[in-house]
Amino acid sequence: FGTMADMDELIAESKKRGIGILIDLTLNHCSDQHRWFRAAKSSRDNPYHDYFLWRDGTPDCPPSGMRSVFGGSAWTYVPEIGQWYFHQFAPEQPDMNWENPKLRQELYDVMKFWVKKGVAGFRLDVIDQIAKEPDKDITINGPRLHEYLRGISENVLTDEGLVTVGRSWLLKNRLFQPQPWRP
C-alpha cells in the first residue's frame, strides 16, 4: 500500500543503502477487476477480448475438463458474450493470452515503467505458465515458453544490472515425472 511517491522514495532510499528493490510480477494472469478484463468480457469485438483465452460453449458444458489448481473447472462462463474464459488458478484470476503480440507489448511496457523508476529487477511468478495451450491440456512449459522469455529479455532486460527470478511452483512436483503431453 502507498502512493507512487512513496515507492519513488523507497527506491531512492534503498539505492542509497545499496539495496535493490525487486518488483513481484505475475505475467500469467491478472485480476478479473483489471480494466483489461472488464473490457474483454464486455464484447467479443472489444480490442482487449483477445488479451485473454476464450472458448465458445454452452452454460452447462465447459470447453474441456481441465481443472483449476485450486479445484473446480479451469473455465468460467460469461453469459453476456456466451463464452468461457480460462483460469489456471481462481476464477478471479483470468489467464492472459501470450499469443497476442499487443498483450506482450503492453506487459513489456509495464516492466519498462518499473525499470525506468529504478527497480533492480523482477520476481516473475509462475512464469513457466505463460505459454499454455489449453486445447491440448498444456498449462506449463508450453512450446513457445522460450520464445516468450526471449521476448522479455530482448525488450526489457537489456540492462545487465537487472536481476530476474522466475518462480515455478508446479515444476517441483513434476521435475522428474513424465509429462502427459510428452512421449
List each model region and its residues.
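Hydrophobic residues within beta-strands of alpha/beta enzymes
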Residues: 122-124
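Acidic/aromatic-lined carbohydrate-recognition and catalytic surfaces
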Residues: 1-108, 112, 116, 127-182
